[in-house]
């Protein structure tokens, strides 16, 4: 398990854009599982939506991308590099994410070729799928 401080040693994101609170599992270059505790104090709830707080779908996808980046950047040959979000396919949102939810973020890397990779990503809340997507990233 990796704490927030250990996560910050691997990926460059910081508040308010660090969207992963803990990494529960990692198989370097293969997969990672993380969590995001969604609280009413999230900055994005000030505008999305003040009277009906819903986590923006694009931020769920970004949280998934950060977990995928962790799996890739933990690899010895990628340490000290950056992982850039390069594309998304087949993204589906199946459940709203609201304050009090804990997002479980799972990314399985399906392809790594040179500086480009792909991953299958799933975000769940209490076992219920909130989002699925296929992510593409580039390492620099």
From Swiss-Prot:
What biological-process GO terms show up in the record? fatty acid biosynthetic process; lipid A biosynthetic process
Record key words, sorted: Cytoplasm, Lipid A biosynthesis, Lipid biosynthesis, Lipid metabolism, Lyase
Q: Which reaction does it catalyse?
A: a (3R)-hydroxyacyl-[ACP] = a (2E)-enoyl-[ACP] + H2O
Q: Which GO terms describe its cellular component?
A: cytoplasm; membrane
Q: Where in the cell is it found?
A: Cytoplasm
Spell out the SUPFAM superfamilies in the cross-references.
Answer: Thioesterase/thiol ester dehydrase-isomerase (SSF54637)
Pfam families named among the record's database cross-references: FabA
> Does the keyword section mention Transmembrane?
no
Q: Would the keyword Lyase turn up in this protein's UniProt record?
A: yes
EC number(s) given by UniProt: 4.2.1.59
According to the lineage, what is the superkingdom?
Bacteria
Taking the first listed entry, what is the main subcellular location of this protein, grouped into a coarse class?
A: cytoplasm
What would you give as a GO molecular function for this chain, any one?
A: (3R)-hydroxyacyl-[acyl-carrier-protein] dehydratase activity
What positions does UniProt annotate as the active site of this protein?
48
Q: What does this protein do?
A: Involved in unsaturated fatty acids biosynthesis. Catalyzes the dehydration of short chain beta-hydroxyacyl-ACPs and long chain saturated and unsaturated beta-hydroxyacyl-ACPs.
Q: Which HAMAP family match?
A: FabZ
Please report which protein family the annotation says this sequence is part of: Belongs to the thioester dehydratase family. FabZ subfamily.
The protein's name = 3-hydroxyacyl-[acyl-carrier-protein] dehydratase FabZ
Q: From which source organism is this entry?
A: Exiguobacterium sibiricum (strain DSM 17290 / CCUG 55495 / CIP 109462 / JCM 13490 / 255-15)
Q: What is the lineage of its organism?
A: Bacteria, Bacillati, Bacillota, Bacilli, Bacillales
């Amino acid at each position: 398990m990796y704490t927030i401080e250990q996560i910050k040693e691997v990926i460059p994101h910081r508040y308010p854009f660090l969207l992963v609170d803990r990494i529960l599992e990692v198989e370097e270059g293969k997969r990672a599982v993380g969590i995001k505790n969604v609280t009413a104090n999230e900055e994005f709830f000030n505008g999305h939506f003040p009277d009906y707080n819903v986590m923006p779908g694009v931020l769920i996808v970004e949280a998934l991308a950060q977990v995928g980046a962790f799996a890739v950047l933990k690899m010895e040959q990628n340490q000290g590099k950056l992982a850039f979000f390069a594309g998304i396919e087949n993204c589906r949102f199946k459940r709203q994410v609201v304050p009090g939810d804990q997002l479980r973020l799972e990314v399985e890397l399906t392809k790594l070729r040179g500086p480009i990779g792909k991953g299958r990503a799933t975000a769940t809340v209490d076992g219920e799928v909130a989002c699925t997507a296929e992510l593409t990233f580039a390492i620099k």
